[in-house]
């Protein structure tokens, strides 16, 4: 019963409002509330406890304690500084190693490029997907001719040979001359399978050559960044391209 009376009394009590900053003190900023004071007080208390712990640690320090890090640290102006260790690899050696890496990758890329050229010459790469397809445009005078247009009839060849861009004989040539090479279905399938296998190999080699080219560019970019010339990054590094930097122009002697 008492709880019910307390709730009823709260519903009728005056609404509590925090005091705001007076008008003549607006230039001093917002009036500090209790929550602001609490944050400031907690921060001050935390710092005091940290200083107290440091003082206690300094008083309890053992003058005979030893750490292995002390052998490579020296005290200079009250600050601990790690001694400089001897370089196992000089910058010139590192630059030479990276140059050899670039040369090796470039050698592999050139080898892949030569294999690609050899495969292209063997396959007579005229209808390869990676190559830009040529367009054959036909012109007509009326819409009726466009609707009745048939590519095989216009080119005077068999419908099966329309998609070819090379070795597309006419019907009269097929009727007059004897077909050379394999004519049975099994032999044709075997030749088509071998040809497709070579095209797949060529596609893989082209992709590998592109990846090697990108890797060589990235290593070369890292080698160029070793120069102390002032530089600005223009483009970030991506999977398919290295980062691009603009170097400060320097007059050559």
Swiss-Prot record:
Record-listed Phosphoserine modification sites: 241
Any GO BP annotation: nervous system development
Keyword Cell cycle: no
Pfam hit, one: Utp11
Segments of this protein annotated with the region Disordered: 1-26
Gene Ontology annotations for the cellular component aspect, listed alphabetically: cytoplasm; cytosol; extracellular space; nucleolus; nucleoplasm; small-subunit processome
InterPro entries, A to Z: SSU_processome_Utp11
Gene Ontology molecular function: any one: RNA binding
This protein's UniProt keywords: Isopeptide bond, Nucleus, Phosphoprotein, rRNA processing, Ubl conjugation
Cross-link Glycyl lysine isopeptide (Lys-Gly) (interchain with G-Cter in SUMO2): residue positions: 74, 83, 86, 103, 120, 143-144, 180, 211, 218, 235-236, 246
Entry keyword annotation includes tRNA processing: no
Modified residues (Phosphothreonine): 90
Oligomer status and interactors: Part of the small subunit (SSU) processome, composed of more than 70 proteins and the RNA chaperone small nucleolar RNA (snoRNA) U3.
Family designation: Belongs to the UTP11 family.
Known role: Part of the small subunit (SSU) processome, first precursor of the small eukaryotic ribosomal subunit. During the assembly of the SSU processome in the nucleolus, many ribosome biogenesis factors, an RNA chaperone and ribosomal proteins associate with the nascent pre-rRNA and work in concert to generate RNA folding, modifications, rearrangements and cleavage as well as targeted degradation of pre-ribosomal RNA by the RNA exosome. Involved in nucleolar processing of pre-18S ribosomal RNA.
Protein name (Swiss-Prot/TrEMBL): Probable U3 small nucleolar RNA-associated protein 11
Origin species: Homo sapiens (Human)
């Amino acid at each position: 019963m008492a709880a019910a009376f307390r709730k009823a009394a709260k519903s009728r009590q005056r609404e509590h409002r925090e005091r705001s900053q007076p008008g003549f003190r607006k230039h001093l900023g917002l009036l500090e509330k209790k929550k602001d004071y609490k944050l400031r007080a907690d921060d001050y208390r935390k710092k005091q406890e940290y200083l107290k712990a440091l003082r206690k640690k300094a008083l309890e320090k053992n003058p005979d304690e030893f750490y292995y890090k002390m052998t490579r640290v020296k005290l200079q102006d009250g600050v601990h500084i790690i001694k400089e260790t001897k370089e196992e690899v000089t910058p010139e050696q590192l630059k030479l190693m990276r140059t050899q890496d670039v040369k090796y990758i470039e050698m592999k890329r050139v080898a892949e490029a030569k294999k690609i050229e050899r495969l292209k010459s063997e396959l007579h790469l005229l209808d390869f997907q990676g190559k830009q397809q040529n367009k054959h445009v036909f012109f007509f005078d009326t819409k009726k001719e466009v609707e009745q247009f048939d590519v095989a009839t216009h080119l005077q060849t068999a419908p099966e040979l329309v998609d070819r861009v090379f070795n597309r004989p006419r019907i009269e040539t097929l009727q007059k001359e004897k077909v050379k090479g394999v004519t049975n279905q099994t032999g044709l399938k075997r030749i088509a399978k071998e040809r497709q296998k070579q095209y797949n190999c060529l596609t893989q080699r082209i992709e590998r050559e592109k990846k090697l080219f990108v890797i060589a560019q990235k290593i070369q970019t890292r080698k160029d960044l070793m120069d102390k010339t002032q530089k600005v990054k223009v483009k970030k590094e991506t999977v398919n391209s290295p980062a691009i930097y603009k170097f400060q122009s320097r007059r050559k002697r």
